[in-house]
Amino acid sequence: MTPRPDPGASNRSGLAEDADIGTSSEDYARRFRGGVGRWFLEIQARNTLKLLRELPAGASILDVGGGHAQIAPQLIDAGYEVTVVGSDPVCAVRLAPWTTKGRCRFEVANLQALPYADRSFDAVTCFRLLPHSVSWSGLIGELCRVARRSVVLDYPSIRSANILSSRLFQLKRAIELNTREFLLFTPSQIHTAFTEGGFIVRKERPQFLLPMVLHRWGNHAALSRFAEAPVRLLGLTRWFGSPIIVRADRRTAGA
């Protein structure tokens, strides 16, 4: 798989951004069960919370496509005011433990044309959506529009073991069963999209050097931690790790 231009960049009208229906499903959640899956989510949550720690207490966060409930619960527990927006009511199912208690709001909207005024939320998060987006540059632009301060999202980098993703796809399908092909990105593509939205990438957190499918295949969290620790210390993960979590901040006047 190679980085490709945004397939929907020239015409976003009428495009249905509904990949979050799949990532909000119970079927998708099974990928993250067991020790390795929990470890994946622990790394993701830890990095995300560190990237957002400059926000004031009680800051408002919009989690776009977050019906997978992979980050909203951690944001809620950290004291943020969280709204999750999804493309369909079915995306709210996994959030019920929080929405039914009033700890989180869920709203349905067109994710390519969010129904919020400019700068409505202190920060916006978006996980598991970009590589399946019908118009990824349009999605980033919309995240930037409604964010007052920061946008945090993840993406699979081509500057990583993902360069072998086409060869590993059959193994990935055999292990995950419901896997889909996905877009890969260069860091420059992501930086450019944020620049066009009036933001600048300030921090990047590559997560794993080895492909996640190999960790799932090994199915041993302690072994995965052991394998990733030395390459992280050597700085290899920083250069060649994926997925990458980035935080982009709104440009100030004159910046």
Model regions: which residues?
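Conserved class I S-adenosyl-L-methionine
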Residues: 2-56, 58-67, 152-174
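Acceptor-substrate binding/catalytic loop of class I
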Residues: 172-189
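A short glycine-rich, Lys/Arg-flanked "PGG" loop and its adjoining helix->strand segment in the class I
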Residues: 137-150
